[in-house]
Amino acid sequence: MSAKEVRTRFAPSPTGYMHVGNLRTALYTYLIAKHENGKFILRIEDTDQGRYVEGAVDVIYKTLEMTGLKHDEGPDVGGPVGPYIQSERKGTYMEYAKELVEKGEAYYCFCDKERLDSLKENSDTFKYDGHCRNLSKEEVEENLKNGVPYVIRQKNPLDGVTTFEDEIYGTISVDNSELEDMILIKSDGLPTYNFANVVDDHLMGITHVVRGNEYLSSAPKYNRLYNAFGWDIPTYVHCPPIMKDAHNKLSKRNGDASFEDLLKKGYLKEAVVNFIALLGWNPGTNQEIFTLEELVKEFDYKNINKSPSIFDTTKLKWMNGEYIKKLSLDEFHKYALPYYEEIFTKEEMETYNLLKLSEQVQTRIEVFTEIPELVAFVKELPNYDISIYSHKKMKTNPENSLVTLEKALPALEALEDWTFDALNDVIYSLVKELEVKNGVVFWPVRTALSGEASSPGGAFELAEILGKKESLRRVRVGIEKLKEAIN
């Protein structure tokens, strides 16, 4: 490792799906490293075995791969400072915890669950009372010899002030009297999240630590550990919370969207990454659409805001729509096919011109889940009201629409080459024959084919999508509906 190399780490716990907040941490961590041509490390923090979810590590790997956040070191790719799974480093933490005990910066705590529970019952906000802080060396050795269960706690000063620097929130000072003697090693011998973080960040040469601002209150305790060991303190980048609305945080516990949920809701992964990048970071320009490569180039963590960010679904939809428009037709069609399969039978998939349908749908949706409802008219002609034949701008009404359809039917029946160009010629010939404006013919034909007031595509496109047989059937239905209503 180069002395000046920027090294960042994403250190998730394998507890389920990748929440939006976690993904933002991963993204910012990646961008900080890559902006400086540094290394992005993946570390799995599985010391809380009670929260471990089977398969969650694979979700982490898959999400990083899908989003393009490729890690340079990690459990699956190796590296010079492994292992990269905390449970595989168990012996390392105990060694460092004992060093702190020897330095008077930590102590063995033998308080049992019953005593700790009674403290919690008698206090609104639980804080360990330091009962074991000053046990004599002999008392400690006797308890250890007798196999009394213990944890190792950090020994924080009871007075004075601890000050630290954060790149987003500036200089922060905390009274030491507010610092709890947090547990470093649990009774099962595994480290706590807080202690393992500090030890691993040092041993792995981490230069920048990105996390949520809920960890600001823990930073003084982390710094006291760094100072106790004589280690360099990394650069802290504490990010503001992501809010569901003005009053509520986006929360995994409340069932708010995970990365997987957003994909299932019809969002493109590239759009999600772009959107999440802007949840707290301001590029300093009006640009809103960024590729990952552009983000690497432009990202400066000093432009992260202090104030919370609102997860604006309307904006995410808009952004996703912009990404959808940029897809090639073949790419879009590939994404659209599973949604067509939701409503069309195998036979219908082969009958209708779905590639043509995709061409019409692509510019009309913001998320892919809008497709089934938008194209439902293709599967089944809606039982529509003839009022939709009336259009002020097109100068149509039920009477002249009936004239148009009755003229159009034989012309369409006679058409052998059912292609866009041929359909175009027939319909335009009809316009000339009737000596009317285009809309007087286009609107009734489009309405008869779709059965809706608005549709993806006009008369020619819909006829091409539906095919000759179904198009003629729908024109006949339109004629019957209009005749019945007028007469």
From Swiss-Prot:
How far does the signal peptide extend, from start to end residue? none
Q: What subcellular locations does the record give?
A: Cytoplasm
Q: Provide this UniProt record's keywords sorted from A to Z.
A: Aminoacyl-tRNA synthetase, ATP-binding, Cytoplasm, Ligase, Nucleotide-binding, Protein biosynthesis
- Going by the entry's taxonomy, the superkingdom of the source organism is recorded as Bacteria
| Family to which this protein belongs | Belongs to the class-I aminoacyl-tRNA synthetase family. Glutamate--tRNA ligase type 1 subfamily.
Enzyme Commission number(s) from the entry = 6.1.1.17
Q: Which GO terms describe its biological process?
A: glutamyl-tRNA aminoacylation
For this UniProt entry, what's an example GO CC term?
cytosol
* Catalysed reactions, semicolon-separated: tRNA(Glu) + L-glutamate + ATP = L-glutamyl-tRNA(Glu) + AMP + diphosphate
The GO terms describing molecular function are:
ATP binding; glutamate-tRNA ligase activity; tRNA binding; zinc ion binding
Quick one: where is this thing mainly located? cytoplasm
Task: Please tell me which top-level EC class this enzyme sits in.
Answer: ligase
Q: Where is this motif: 'KMSKS' region?
A: 249-253
What's the subunit arrangement here? Monomer.
> Per its UniProt record, what InterPro entries does this chain match?
aa-tRNA-synth_I_cd-bd, aa-tRNA-synth_I_codon-bd_sub2, aa-tRNA-synth_I_CS, aa_tRNA-synth_I_cd-bd_sf, Glu-tRNA-ligase_bac/mito, Glu/Gln-tRNA-synth, Glu/Gln-tRNA-synth_Ib_cat-dom, GluQ/Sye
| Gene3D superfamilies, sorted | 1.10.10.350, HUPs (3.40.50.620)
Q: What does this protein do?
A: Catalyzes the attachment of glutamate to tRNA(Glu) in a two-step reaction: glutamate is first activated by ATP to form Glu-AMP and then transferred to the acceptor end of tRNA(Glu).
Q: Which NCBIfam families match?
A: gltX_bact
UniProt protein name: Glutamate--tRNA ligase
Which residues of the sequence carry a binding annotation for ATP? K252
Motif extent ('HIGH' region): 12-22
